[in-house]
């Protein structure tokens, strides 16, 4: 069945791409195709080979996380499934159009229509960062040998004014909770390795109580907790910490993650398999726009999120466009 779209939660503010994205230049030399691993006993040689790839260099975040060391040890994502729920994805982009790149049961359309090109841009960019093809063209993702299980949902957009969600016993979140629990359960039932959630409600987790969060999202918490599984077998859920720093001039407190990213701070059964991700610049310092780990420091990681080059959905036959985005989604 086509999943029922959730009632427009406010996503993390989508960044604006740099002007007029252009197709990536053809690299000067051919490299091993997607899925190929250089078999060698020489770790340094393998690491150097990956680092010399034009695709590796184009995605500047790879060097910061030392991805080449993982690749040289054979950790390329093979055998894993990454789950992404976003407003749409361009499955025909050259970074995502591999024969088995998207699972056949991915949900690429809404219940009533297909996503527009604009609606597919954020999810396309995020997906290619995670697992874009290593095919001697453009850039490649962190786990380039992984598969993608994608769910398209309608999302609202963050406005110029920061608007913290009202979450307490006076607000009925039953419909939202029903939808989110159903959607997140698709990932759990699929046995997805890790799920990226680049959306959520604005508002510092410090401003909410455990009681209010449990009252609003009981079914979603139950699904995310996966109480019937050992910790090592659970699907991991990674949430954008939020871009509250971009609203600092409005007096916004971005010292801790927003609602979804901060869930494990308040909900103990989510601490083994849920975490927030903050953004750092390429020099390793935290990005000015990013929420901080704060009270959720024990359930929080950092990743490059400033000016990250990745796939860009475009209404053009080439499907080979790229752009830079910034944000904790990246």
Predicted regions mapped to residue ranges:
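Subtilisin-like serine protease catalytic core
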Residues: 25-50, 54-59, 68-104, 111-175, ...
